Amino acid sequence: MLKKLCVILFISSITINSHAKNMYDNVDTATSYDSTYYENEGSLVFKMRLGGIFASAKQKGLPTHSSVQPVSVGEIAKNGYGGDASTTIFFNNYLAAELSLGFNVLRTKYTSLAAVAHNYGINNVKLGKHKPIYMIPATLTGQFHIAPYGGIRPYIGIGYHGSYMLTQATGLKIRNGYNAVGQIGVDFYAKDDTLINIDVRQFFLKPKLEYKSNLVGNKKVTSKVKLNPLIVSIGIGFTF
């Protein structure tokens, strides 16, 4: 459902901007049109965003267990929230590069940790309070701005990220990860060099998990977790 809404938003933005361009081309220069309206932005854009994170967190590659009555492990993390700051450099009206640094929080599912303990090691382990998984991605994205005129400007992008991962969850260690990222968004420009940004990014991320001895005893239990977080953000930007 969320991806369908993104597609609708993207197509709507293209339609609006195509109509805006036609109107702009037909405006006579002798009219009262303000030529500086939306035309005074610079080649640098700084953005700050907050958003929600949707992650599947499915595990793959768990070793064969010896439990007589095994239980399903399920997803290791819940959806979360986060934010990022970015700088976009425009090479021309259509092409740009965005460098961003984010901080995201996912909640671990202790039912999954308890299932791992049951299947591979220590039963009835006390896990304490929920502890988050932190994802800190540094991302470089190449962008194509489809309609770089008017007040509504959609863009698409593709890039690469390296994500520093850590957690305070009992019995769990998560490795860093890196992979591709896809991006789609819209900038809504105002007259005073500010903008509102709606941004959707699909991160591809499969970090390695390692379970500690307090969960699995002296066994070595590792897996790959398919996080692939989808981050939907809204924020404010400033042009320079």
Swiss-Prot record:
According to UniProt, the name of this protein is Putative outer membrane protein RT0057
Do you know which Pfam families this protein is assigned to?
A: OmpW
Cell location: Cell outer membrane
> Its GO CC terms?
cell outer membrane
**The organism's place on the tree of life at top rank:** Bacteria
Alphabetic keyword roster: Cell outer membrane, Membrane, Signal, Transmembrane, Transmembrane beta strand
Any Gene Ontology biological process: transmembrane transport
Which InterPro entries is this protein grouped with?
A: OMP/PagP_b-brl, OMPW
Q: Which organism is it from?
A: Rickettsia typhi (strain ATCC VR-144 / Wilmington)
Span of the signal peptide: 1-20
Primary localisation category: membrane
Q: Which family does it belong to?
A: Belongs to the OmpW/AlkL family.
Q: What is the lineage of its organism?
A: Bacteria, Pseudomonadati, Pseudomonadota, Alphaproteobacteria, Rickettsiales
